[in-house]
Amino acid sequence: MSKIKVLIVDDSALVRQMLQEMLKSDPEIEVVGTASDPYDAREKVKQLHPDVLTLDVEMPRMDGVTFLKNLMRLHPLPVVMISTLTEKGADITFEALDLGAVDFVAKPKIDLQHTFEDYTDEICRKVKTASKVSKWQLERQYARYVANKESKPKVLSKPGSLVSKVVEKFTTDAIVPKKAPSDFSKPSHKVIALGASTGGTEAIKEVLMRLPSTTPAIVITQHIPASFSLPFAQRMNSVSEMEVTQAEDRQPILAGHVYIAPGDKHLLVERTSSGYICRLNDGPPVNRHKPSVDVMFRTVVQSVGKNAVGVLLTGMGADGAKGMKELQEIGVPTIVQDEKTCVVWGMPGEAVKLGAADYVLPLGSIPEKILALIKK
């Protein structure tokens, strides 16, 4: 089997060296070259024909987003962005994901010794995942970006760690012990529970842009760094008719509102005498993730019951698949994004394997199905 050819683009010689060392440690990956700026990268893409690029977000002469825009227009390639974990870095990274970048990782730190193995594992996994993304998928995402820019959707006037430590593998039970759902005979509000990972920031945007302000409450767990979740919520708030916020502990869950899990806390849904509230939990990662989709889904089973709708979008791994099965087993309708429109059909694919998906739909059909199900 031929190796995945990677071109590293970064203005820092030290970062280029670190990334090269990490990627070369994987027998399935070959680093075919490095470039210090986008002009150098442009020539090396033509010469070396890489399968995947790692691209620094912020560089001199031409920034990573401008280069990515030209690349996706002229020579689409899977790209993993190397991002600084800052508000500015978050904004640039989200624009890169808009353009068609497959995923992102934090820029490696100089004092990486204690987390070197974890970082190496993460970037190698993401490069290998990116290599499976087709040219057609990249072209479709870029066309969607251009269409959204040309349509200039009105921005509504509203207020508005990627390097994980070595952790034990915990199950959902470590955060939310399994128990029978409460009595849901009394009428209560609907809640839509949505989970996503790789490719999810764009998929979530596509869903939220098509839901009216009258939609019931939505709780979202997206795998994302802690410093990125608030900018992500603000970005979603600017394109949605619903009010989108980063969830806060004990925040009431209201219709017409969207609550996004902070990047370093599990989001739980709790039922009170007056309705539902968000609870934030600082327990260990589950399925190697914090926040975890399975954890959120478990609490929706226990607190919302049949008044919920479960949705699982694009993402690497299996987080959310078991939780979706638990939702389905109590009669909650479940929707999974189909393989063709996913960046990575990991989490949705695992849900399908478990028989947990009532509906397997292309991304563009999911908002309509959500609206149909909440009327039942």
UniProtKB/Swiss-Prot annotation:
Q: Where is the Response regulatory domain?
A: 5-122
Q: Which Pfam families match?
A: CheB_methylest, Response_reg
Family (UniProt): Belongs to the CheB family.
The gene coding this protein: cheB
Name the residues annotated as catalytic in the UniProt entry: S197, H223, D319
Record protein name field = Protein-glutamate methylesterase/protein-glutamine glutaminase
Gene Ontology terms: cellular component = cytoplasm
The places in or outside the cell where this protein is found are: Cytoplasm
